[in-house]
């Protein structure tokens, strides 16, 4: 396949999205005084839906994140209640796409936890999860909900494994064990029948998620992939990464032939990771760099030139991560087609950015709001596990978003297991995360071994004394 080198010059074409612009929310509509995490893990540390905004925070000891009602803008008090049940730093959070009060989190403590947030937000710290999932042997860096099947959750750990959890029973039902290094990114196609992953071994893979079978795999020498996203139903993959000259790069792939990219383009020489965001309704692709404040956006087409540059949103404040509002949470009366929630660590602030199509008419714009993925699941967990594939249940945004939340989460009743030694529950103790913690654990174990040896020697001495007394009793003359 011939690789098409794209020109750096913007290619103008007739497009309804040519004049899309970014609009920053006013100061009173931002979220201030939030202690955003300083963790360097390459995640967004932010998740949003039409009811809540969740942000991973910086804490001493354990891990926590804030959950704020979306309308509660302005200054957030330092003692605002947190979700703080993890024993290690929280690395990723994701809202359930079908039950808006349910959020999943993963952490350095090797666990995945499911939380139920009450309507109106938290009134006190929440430390008890409705479900705790243990299966990884090392920290868990990524989680993703299945796009069409309810209560199916994927988690990727630093043990190089992907676990598939059925939350109806609270257990891992499948394991994908084809990666040879840390998994960097996971992305589903529209109906969730395919899973694309990028890995630290520099390979891009397309998998059948139920069996874990690798359908396509590539290690392109000219493009070291870091992030991947499926482009809707176009049978295309989009990746970002770096070239062999360490310049930031993007590439487009045929999902059925990963031997060479369909097209690739170098962006710039900055070092920050490029996060891709794709809107399947408008076929627009957004590129946001970690550590810089700009967001580039393109239009994707099935024919050449495939990627058409539209515009760039510029901002002086660098972003640590970006949350994205689901389509049913947008303001259609303002012709809003995408909304970011930008994490600005320098200001301890979350800044909403709306991408808007300028229109003079105030009527509903059906050409920019087609039927979109809705809030109803297409499949039950057992149906998907049996091999059934279904596309998302579509909804119209014409009447605005008025959801009656019929789906509820019922946590399975699981017997709590424990292994208590010297008053310490070994199953509750997390693996050491640092060299100092490892040394402390080593010295504790050495001290425990020393005590056990002392107890054994004392018992040996007692046994010998009892044996001697028994022998004396046997040898003593019997009373006549």
Curated annotation (Swiss-Prot):
SMART domains associated with the record: DUF1899 (SM01166), DUF1900 (SM01167), WD40 (SM00320)
WD repeat residue intervals: 85-125, 135-177, 179-217, 220-263, 265-308
Disulfide bond annotation, renumbered to this chain: none
Organism domain of life: Eukaryota
Location in or out of the cell: Cytoplasm, Cytoskeleton
UniProt keywords, alphabetically: Actin-binding, Coiled coil, Cytoplasm, Cytoskeleton, Repeat, WD repeat
InterPro entries: Coronin, DUF1899, WD40/YVTN_repeat-like_dom_sf, WD40_repeat_CS, WD40_repeat_dom_sf, WD40_rpt
One GO cellular component, as annotated: cytoplasm
GO function terms (MF aspect): actin binding
Coiled coil stretches, renumbered: 436-475
Family named by the database record: Belongs to the WD repeat coronin family.
Cited PANTHER family: CORONIN (PTHR10856), CORONIN-2B (PTHR10856:SF17)
Function: May play a role in the reorganization of neuronal actin structure.
Designated name of the protein: Coronin-2B
Species for this entry: Xenopus tropicalis
Gene name, Swiss-Prot/TrEMBL: coro2b
């Amino acid at each position: 396949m011939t690789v098409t080198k794209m020109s750096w010059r913007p290619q103008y074409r007739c497009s309804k999205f040519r004049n899309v612009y970014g609009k920053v929310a006013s100061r009173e509509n931002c979220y201030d005084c939030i202690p955003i995490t300083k963790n360097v893990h390459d995640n967004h540390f932010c998740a949003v839906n039409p009811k809540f905004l969740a942000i991973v925070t910086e804490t001493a000891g354990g891990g926590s994140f804030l959950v704020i009602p979306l309308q509660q803008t302005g200054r957030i008090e330092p003692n605002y209640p947190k979700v703080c049940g993890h024993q290690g730093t929280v690395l990723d959070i994701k809202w359930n796409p079908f039950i808006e009060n349910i959020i999943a989190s993963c952490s350095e403590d090797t666990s995945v936890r499911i939380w139920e947030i009450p309507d109106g937000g938290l009134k006190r710290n929440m430390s008890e999860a409705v479900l705790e999932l243990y299966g990884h042997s090392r920290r868990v860096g990524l989680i993703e909900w299945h796009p069409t099947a309810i209560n199916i959750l994927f988690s990727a750990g630093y043990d190089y494994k992907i676990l598939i959890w059925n939350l109806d029973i609270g257990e891992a039902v499948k394991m994908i064990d084809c990666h040879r290094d840390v998994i960097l990114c996971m992305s589903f196609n529209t109906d969730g029948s395919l899973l694309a992953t990028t890995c630290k071994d520099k390979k891009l893979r397309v998998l059948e998620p139920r069996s874990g079978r690798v359908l396509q795999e590539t290690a392109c020498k000219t493009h070291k992939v870091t992030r991947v996203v499926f482009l809707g139903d176009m049978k295309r993959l989009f990746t970002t990464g770096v070239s062999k000259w360490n310049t930031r790069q993007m590439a487009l792939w045929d999902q059925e032939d990963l031997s060479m990219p369909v097209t690739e383009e170098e962006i710039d020489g900055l070092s920050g990771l490029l996060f891709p965001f794709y809107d399947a309704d408008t076929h627009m692709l957004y590129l946001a760099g970690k550590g810089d404040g700009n967001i580039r956006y393109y239009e994707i087409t099935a024919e050449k030139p495939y990627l058409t540059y539209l515009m760039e949103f510029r901002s002086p404040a660098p972003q640590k991560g970006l949350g994205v509002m689901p389509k049913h949470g947008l303001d259609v009366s303002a012709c809003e087609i995408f909304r970011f929630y930008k994490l600005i660590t320098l200001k301890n602030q979350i800044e909403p950015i709306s991408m808007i199509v300028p229109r003079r008419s105030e009527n509903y714009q059906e050409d920019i709001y087609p039927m979109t993925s809705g809030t109803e699941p297409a499949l039950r967990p057992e149906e998907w596990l049996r091999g059934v594939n279904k596309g998302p249940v579509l909804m119209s945004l014409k009447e605005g978003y008025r959801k009656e939340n019929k789906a509820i989460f019922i946590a399975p009743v699981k017997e709590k297991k424990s292994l208590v030694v010297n008053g310490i529950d070994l199953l509750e103790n997390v693996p050491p995360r640092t060299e100092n913690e490892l040394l402390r654990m080593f010295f504790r174990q050495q001290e425990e071994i020393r005590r056990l040896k002392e107890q054994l020697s004392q018992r040996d001495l007692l046994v010998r004394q009892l044996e001697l007394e028994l022998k004396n009793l046997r040898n003593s003359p019997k009373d006549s």
